[in-house]
């Protein structure tokens, strides 16, 4: 089997795929944001264990979601702890017995944790969580597309058209962001979807916020339509052009160096490809590590899958000791970027 070699400035790093080595014990990825499972079901744990153990691979089992966003299971506030599995809304009570049950069967549990997502905590008139606290801007409902008036024959039912967002319809966009999510999932290039993301984004520009929740934009308006309506601090996007797009001092956050933008712009905290974070001195501007093979990867950006440690999490939040402990746990267990997903190991 051929193993890929990563070259960088004369150095070589051996990247071993995850499937190349069998772990000493079966692995189970314990998710917190996938499709919810009703109730506390230890019977499912027993069944999953029988499936996971012979294959020596990864499986996914999801606990019940917290009540903040009942249909998606998103966390209500950031969580960063090396010693306990903490979820807002009582998930700890459900998670600990499950982990103990797997440990009793010799199954090593890995939890997929996201700490930089933010969800709305207030319902609108339809009972959907899509209103934001006033302290981050005016709490507003995402606008709907105006109804189209059509000439119709007597007896025909009136057809309505709304913006294709989960917050507007409450049930659409299941393939992109899930049903009833608390952020917009706009698809298309009409007038209303163009105006919706910048308006919503400006009200959530304070970190940590979800700065890149809109996948599958149309390229023709993704760059100019969004970037021209937001500041550099809050720009967002997923489409990349060739070459580096950031240039800053070694201790500063990334800044755009192209005008007009050649691709979808990015937020300093999210949606940045690590290999593009090299400054003029060859180091990452404001981030920890710029070489993916050497970067610490316990934080997962769900939108892009970029492995990174956020600069403000390491210093500004005073979590250096906790992060270093998590890093040491990952190193001892052999968790590295070749796993394909960034996970936290829950210690026994």
Swiss-Prot record:
Record-annotated site: Transition state stabilizer: 303
The enzyme's main class, written as a single word, is hydrolase
Q: Name one GO molecular function term.
A: alpha-amylase activity
Co-factor binding details: Binds 3 Ca(2+) ions per subunit.
Cite the record's Low complexity compositional bias ranges. Answer: 161-188, 223-266
Keywords, ordered alphabetically? Calcium, Carbohydrate metabolism, Glycosidase, Hydrolase, Metal-binding
Write down the EC number: 3.2.1.1
Q: Which residues bind Ca(2+)?
A: 116, 188
Ranges of biased composition (kind: Polar residues): 189-207
Query: Which cofactor does the UniProt annotation name?
Result: Ca(2+)
Please give the catalytic activity noted in the UniProt record: Endohydrolysis of (1->4)-alpha-D-glucosidic linkages in polysaccharides containing three or more (1->4)-alpha-linked D-glucose units
The record's annotation in InterPro entries points to:
Glycoside_hydrolase_SF
- Annotated region (Disordered), positions in chain: 126-266
Main role? Important for breakdown of endosperm starch during germination.
**Subunit structure comment from the entry:** Monomer.
Which family does the record claim for this protein? Belongs to the glycosyl hydrolase 13 family.
Q: Which PANTHER family match?
A: ALPHA-AMYLASE (PTHR43447)
Question: What name does UniProt use for this protein?
Answer: Alpha-amylase isozyme C
Give the gene symbol.
Answer: AMYC
